[in-house]
Curated annotation (Swiss-Prot):
Recorded name of the encoding gene: tolB
Residue ranges the record marks as coiled coil: none
Function comment: Part of the Tol-Pal system, which plays a role in outer membrane invagination during cell division and is important for maintaining outer membrane integrity.
Protein name per its UniProtKB record: Tol-Pal system protein TolB
Disordered as annotated region, ranges: 288-310
Organism: Rhizobium leguminosarum bv. trifolii (strain WSM2304)
Recorded family membership: Belongs to the TolB family.
Length: 435
């Protein structure tokens, strides 16, 4: 049974501490040009927090910021000032000497009731002032989550955009040989830590997807040798079949309001796209072709759906209205296109492209213009968006490798990183921000 310790156990009380929180970012902002793929990361000094868990918390914060590609944490050996009192103003000149455009100080203390209190301050050395400060309370076992929350706060203060570090990823954990591969649903923090198995591996599972509430996951399972779409309650571990259809159902995904599941239903050699209302259990057919229509994904406003179809001879990306009208092809490059997924911002659609014997992860605008390839390899597939729409995660099977691995990459295409998992991993799906 799935426990909810990471879902509900964290009680966060955030508030400003000390000086006023300025709404303007640091004087040296992150420079991001997605058209050219150029990023000038901001040098930032993340000091060891005071307290027993302080060093570990600051290490997670620095790792989060570095992985974003927008920040360059300064090596601690370059620090001139040793912070002994995180409440006091630092010696700004010492931090300007090492070009720290931003400085993070803080402490972690244990309260009388057993909770941890984590507090931080973000400073602008060149302006000589505090930018923001907050404090959070949680249970000791959730110290990593507090570190992610602090990293999100720093990211937002400096970039003006929401962070994505306090999020989770559901994926398919793969172990064993290719001939006897065991596949389990698993969930983890976005940095690969705190992995938990959600299924026992007795049945093949594919394409898990989070609900907007983060409390449910929909996925495809071959339980009882019958491919079906299931709903899994993360808190209780209870699962149920989504509809009792005569054919195979697959490629499920929630609507933005969480009221529907959109999926593909196979009928003979064809498959079409349907929605099911989770309250009334009524279904609506959106496509009707003698082809394979699959991989549907809603736009963030729920008004449109992108999907994959081979109705033109090979898989391509199409867009239609949420009621099935206005079906329009948007991909016209060389090769075939699959697994389209709409950005949370609504401005881009990510996809898998197969051409020249290789698989690429790319993005295009919803009208098909502005196609950009972010990474190419032997087999890259299954992009999923971070909730801020700036980073993608996908899985890669290298030539001759034992199994697939998860990777992340930002929209510049120049910050590709391995997401380490205990075993092989595929089919990642990013959660919305935690609450």
């Amino acid at each position: 049974m799935v426990k909810c310790s990471l879902i509900r156990a964290l009680m966060v009380i955030a508030g400003l501490i000390g000086a006023a929180a300025f709404t303007t970012p640091a004087n040296a902002l992150v420079t991001l040009d997605l058209r050219k793929g150029n990023v000038q990361p901001m040098p930032i000094a993340v000091t060891d927090f005071q307290g027993d868990l302080g060093a570990q918390v600051s290490q997670v914060i620095a790792a989060d910021l570095q992985r974003s590609g927008l920040f360059a944490p300064i090596n601690k050996t370059a620090f001139i000032e040793k912070i002994s009192n995180p409440d006091a103003a630092p010696r700004f000149e010492d931090w300007k000497v090492i070009n720290a455009q931003a400085l993070v100080t803080g402490r972690v203390t244990k309260e009388a009731d057993g909770r941890l209190r984590a507090e931080f301050r973000l400073w602008d050395p060149f302006a000589g002032q505090q930018m923001t400060g907050q404090q959070f309370y949680t249970q000791p076992e959730n110290w990593r989550r507090v570190a992610h929350i602090i990293a999100d706060a720093i990211y937002k203060q400096i970039t003006g955009e929401e962070g994505y570090f306090d999020t989770r990823v559901v994926f398919v954990s793969e172990s064993g040989t290719k001939q006897q591969r065991k596949r389990q649903l698993a969930i983890m923090d976005q940095d690969g830590f705190n992995v938990r198995m959600l299924t026992d591996g007795s049945d093949l599972v594919l394409t898990p997807r989070f609900s907007p509430s983060r409390q449910e996951v929909t996925y495809m399972s071959f339980a009882n040798q019958q491919p079906r779409v299931y709903l899994l309650q993360l808190e209780t571990g209870q699962r149920e079949v989504v509809g009792n259809f005569p054919g195979m159902t697959f490629s499920p995904r929630f609507s933005p309001d969480g009221q529907k599941v959109i999926m593909s239903l196979q009928q003979d050699a064809n498959s079409n796209i349907y929605t099911m209302d989770l309250r009334s259990r009524t279904t609506t057919r959106l496509t009707s072709t003698a082809a394979i229509d699959t991989s549907p994904s809603y736009s963030p406003d729920g008004a449109r759906v992108s999907f994959e179809s081979d109705r033109g001879g090979k898989p391509q990306i199409y867009v239609m209205n949420a009621d099935g009208s206005g079906q329009t092809r948007i991909s016209f490059g060389d090769g075939s296109y699959s697994t389209p997924v709409w950005s949370p911002r609504g401005d881009l659609i990510a996809f898998t492209k197969q051409a020249g014997g290789k698989f690429s992860i790319g993005v295009m605008k919803p009208d098909g213009s502005g196609e950009r390839i972010l990474t190419t390899g032997f087999h890259n597939e299954g992009p999923t968006w971070a909730p801020n729409g700036r980073v993608l995660m996908f899985f890669r099977q290298a030539a001759g490798a034992g199994g697939p691995q998860l990777y992340s990459i930002d929209l510049t295409g120049y910050n590709e990183q391995l997401v380490k998992t205990p075993s092989y991993g595929s089919d990642p799906a990013w959660s919305p921000l935690m609450e």
